[in-house]
Amino acid sequence: MSEKKINLLDLDRKAMRALFADLGEKPFRADQLMKWIYHFGVSDFEEMTNINKVLRQKLAARCEIVAPEISSFQKSTDGTIKFAIHVGEGQEVETVYIPEDDRATLCVSSQVGCALECTFCSTAQQGFNRNLTVSEIVGQIWRVSHFLGFAKDTGDRPITNVVMMGMGEPLLNLANVIPAMDIMLDDFGFSLSKRRVTLSTSGVVPALDKLGDALDVALAVSIHAPNDELRDILVPVNKKYPLQEFLAGIRRYIAKSNANRGRVTVEYVMLDHINDSTEQAHELAKLMKDTPCKVNLIPFNPYPGSPYGRSSNSRIDRFSKVLMEYGLTVIVRKTRGDDIDAACGQLAGDIRDRTKRLAKKRMQENQISVTMN
């Protein structure tokens, strides 16, 4: 039985250099290889012309460069593209490309499903199977870059920003997310600015502290409720890490980070008559008074079976004005890709659930019903 080959997309620069040392090669050779992979999108060792033939043969014998395949894609009327990415065992995760005038953002998944059970999110309703590997995370960027047109002659890449806001909670897959983000930031990797790579979390506080010790990237935090009572229902991880504990962790991260320019982005989904009252706006503003932030209000994007509705424009406008009265910077997110179920909270994929999600779902729906009445 032949030995399983090493997928080089699983290795950040430190691990790549360790591999090359094991091959008896100098560190700069590892850097050359990474440049071929991430700057020029090359997966065939024979195309790497500044690497000698003997080393190319060694690499071909022991290693491979394999990204997950695109199973299908849908294009929105606004230019957004949703990709279904095959990750084995008949499962798919979803990745979303969002073009804008001054940037091109890829929304990347970190898990096959999600274990956090946020009640307004389509991904959570699919259950959870496993964490994505490093190669499956960076492979989303690599594969979509090829789809969009990797410029092999110049190294120009079609993706300028990456947001870890796809399927899954990134901080529950820290062992793979950290090296994947290292590759995104590395000069020999995707070479993205730390301000152009954003991680979004619902509040796994110990892992947030570990992230701050390991990396400096932009941070977005999913708050979604102005108090623990409501957040316990909307974002159940709040029962383990309540708001004040989460906010303290956010402030510790800000103190370590340059990428955030002294503040984080607060994400707040607008659910009709659930968390969008004027009183709740005052409550949110007071909650955030000691945490430097800008607030991103996200109109809820419905999905089949959801118990929630989208807040009206007038309610969103009133909520926004209250926050601004407290001196907060407020942005109402423009919905992109909702006609192809690619908008925030709509990603679902194809998941083999390993949790008892469906049994719990009925209990959550009962809680929501009580809150709405």
Swiss-Prot record:
Binds 1 [4Fe-4S] cluster. The cluster is coordinated with 3 cysteines and an exchangeable S-adenosyl-L-methionine. Disulfide bonds join 107-344. PROSITE patterns: RADICAL_SAM. It catalyses: adenosine(2503) in 23S rRNA + 2 reduced [2Fe-2S]-[ferredoxin] + 2 S-adenosyl-L-methionine = 2-methyladenosine(2503) in 23S rRNA + 5'-deoxyadenosine + L-methionine + 2 oxidized [2Fe-2S]-[ferredoxin] + S-adenosyl-L-homocysteine; adenosine(37) in tRNA + 2 reduced [2Fe-2S]-[ferredoxin] + 2 S-adenosyl-L-methionine = 2-methyladenosine(37) in tRNA + 5'-deoxyadenosine + L-methionine + 2 oxidized [2Fe-2S]-[ferredoxin] + S-adenosyl-L-homocysteine. It holds the Pfam family Radical_SAM. Its cofactor is [4Fe-4S] cluster. Reaction proceeds by a ping-pong mechanism involving intermediate methylation of a conserved cysteine residue. HAMAP family: RNA_methyltr_RlmN. Specifically methylates position 2 of adenine 2503 in 23S rRNA and position 2 of adenine 37 in tRNAs. m2A2503 modification seems to play a crucial role in the proofreading step occurring at the peptidyl transferase center and thus would serve to optimize ribosomal fidelity. This is Dual-specificity RNA methyltransferase RlmN. It comes from Shewanella sp. (strain W3-18-1).
